[in-house]
Design a protein with these regions (language model features):
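Periplasmic-binding protein-like
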Residues: 126-130
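Hydrophobic h-region of N-terminal signal peptides that target proteins for export
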Residues: 11-19
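N-terminal hydrophobic alpha-helix used for membrane targeting or insertion
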Residues: 9, 23-24
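Enrichment for repetitive, rod-forming helical segments
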Residues: 10-11, 59
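Active-site-proximal alpha-helix that buttresses catalytic centers in soluble enzyme cores
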Residues: 24-124, 135-193
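N-terminal export leaders
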Residues: 3-8
Length: 193
């Protein structure tokens, strides 16, 4: 009997901890994009992708939502792989113009580790992340967001390159659904579904 009570108390404590755990970095905004268009071959981006990457420079230097300027102060991209350097190449023009270093320590399957790093080290900032589209749902989930809220069927479509997911976090690091959304950046013709 005593053991059952102990287990019940332990379980209840775990539920309370989970209910109050923070989703993302406190007092922060996280912007998530997919890398620019793929080159026909190799690990880079296409000429259209290069135009998008260059357009992101001014777009994110002047990023405004609801009349509030949200210029990124931290930049993360998925780690380069043998097949793709696209996330890093997509944000290099912006990072150079903003004089920010790109953090490339986290690979595709390290969304939980990236989210933990953001919670621990990036509070009070606007954070820009460029990721590979099949792994964005896991990144959203790791930040306490429901992928189906932002992506059709909870997946980023393969042909879409022009969305920005904006996640807003309060002083406790909890997601603010009313201030979080998907934005169509309208930098290049086409791309949305």
């Amino acid at each position: 009997m005593c053991r059952r009570v102990f287990i019940a108390i332990l379980f209840a404590s775990a539920l309370i901890f989970v209910a109050h755990a923070q989703d993302g970095p406190k007092n922060s905004f996280v912007l998530i994009i997919r890398h620019a268009e793929d080159a026909d071959s190799g690990d880079g981006i296409s000429p259209l992708g290069e135009k998008r990457a260059d357009a992101y420079k001014d777009y994110f230097l002047n990023f405004t939502v609801d009349s509030k300027r949200l210029e990124p102060k931290a930049v993360f991209t998925a780690k380069d792989s043998k097949k793709s350097h696209r996330p890093r190449l997509t944000l290099e023009p912006f990072a150079k113009a903003a004089k920010l270093k790109i953090d490339t320590r986290f690979g595709n399957s390290q969304s939980a580790e990236l989210a933990a790093n953001l919670r621990a080290n990036q509070q009070g900032k606007v954070i820009l992340i460029c990721w590979r589209h099949p792994y964005i749902p896991a990144l959203l989930d790791a930040l306490g967001a429901t992928p189906k809220t932002f992506l059709p069927n909870g997946k980023w479509p393969g042909a879409v390159f022009n969305w920005v997911i904006l996640l807003s976090f309060d002083q406790e690091g909890h997601l603010i659904p009313s201030n979080s959304r998907r934005i169509d950046e309208h930098l290049m013709p086409g791309g949305s579904q």
